[in-house]
Design a protein with these regions (language model features):
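A conserved structural motif in NAD(P)-dependent oxidoreductases
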Residues: 208-219, 230
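Conserved mid-core segment of classical short-chain dehydrogenase/reductases
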Residues: 89-106, 149-153, 193-197
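Conserved glycine-rich cofactor-binding loop
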Residues: 16-17
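Alpha-helical segment proximal to the catalytic Tyr-Lys
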Residues: 125, 170-171, 232
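Short, small/polar-rich loop/turn modules that mediate ligand/substrate recognition or access, typified
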Residues: 173, 178, 234-236
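Catalytic Tyr-X3-Lys loop
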Residues: 98-117, 132, 136, 161
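Catalytic loop of short-chain dehydrogenase/reductase
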Residues: 90, 134-160, 165-174, 186
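Short C-terminal tail/terminal secondary-structure segment
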Residues: 224, 235-248
Length: 248
């Protein structure tokens, strides 16, 4: 049995993305108090707010520091966050590394790393005072082994998050805070729908387990586990969810 602590206050970024919405739906069913941040669309999570009293959706551009800070102040003035899940979704563009300009790297770093850092600075003091907390970021299996071509801005931003996760796990462990990441291989989401069919078929054929892409629920199930008491002695881990396509 998955041992869930009593109702937790959980903050989720990218909550309307393919993975984020799957996480949100699963944790809503666990009756957790959810604060779901989204930027553009809320079509996948609107029904959650209408179905569950414990779900609140909030429009916020997390790469905009001022907007993010205002949202966080409002949330933490009345709620102590127990779990922070970082799952920002951003359309992936393929580009030769030398054709990228620094602004594109900066854009990815702002979305993935800067927002993660800024949110952590808000929620970690609360977690420290409770001597308990969970921080989970969604990365990519591309941070392990050889990266693919043409995705340098995305891969570099995810590597930066991996480094931040390890540093935070190391420094916050004494306060009872677990910091981990999950690295899925290619996931069947709106973000990957635009990829050429042939590319996806080649990729699937190389996955040992069931020759299929990862599903959002495959990732959400691991998030649910990390949120539970069963994972209270796991920190500093990057958990691969890749059907065996990446091993280390």
């Amino acid at each position: 049995v998955m041992k869930m602590t009593s109702k937790q206050n959980i903050l989720i970024t990218g909550s309307n993305g393919g993975i984020g919405s799957s996480i949100s739906k699963l944790l809503a069913k666990d009756n957790e108090n959810l604060f779901l941040l989204y930027n553009k669309n809320n079509d996948k999570i609107l029904e959650l707010e209408n179905t569950y009293d414990s779900v609140k959706i909030i429009k916020t551009d997390i790469s905009n520091s001022v907007e993010l800070n205002n949202t966080l102040k409002n949330i933490i003035s009345e709620n102590s966050i127990d779990v922070f899940i970082h799952s920002p979704a951003y359309p992936i563009q393929h580009s030769d590394i030398l054709k990228l300009n620094w602004e594109i790297f900066q854009q990815q770093l702002n979305l993935h790393l800067k927002s993660f850092f800024e949110i952590s600075k808000f929620v970690v003091p609360q977690m420290k005072s409770n001597n308990h907390g969970k921080i989970i970021s969604i990365l990519t299996s591309y941070v392990v082994g050889r990266p693919p071509n043409l995705l340098a801005d995305y891969v570099v931003a995810k590597h930066a998050l991996l480094g931040m996760m390890k540093c935070m796990a190391n420094e916050l462990g004494s306060s009872g805070i677990c910091v981990n990441s999950i690295s899925p291989s290619m996931v069947d989401t709106p973000l990957t729908e635009s990829l050429p069919k042939k590319l996806k078929e080649i990729y699937q054929s190389q996955v040992p387990l069931e020759k299929r892409l990862a599903k959002p629920i495959d990732v959400a199930n691991i998030v649910q586990f990390l949120c539970s008491e069963n994972a209270n002695y796991i920190t500093g881990e990057n958990i691969l969810v890749s059907g065996g396509s990446t091993m280390h």
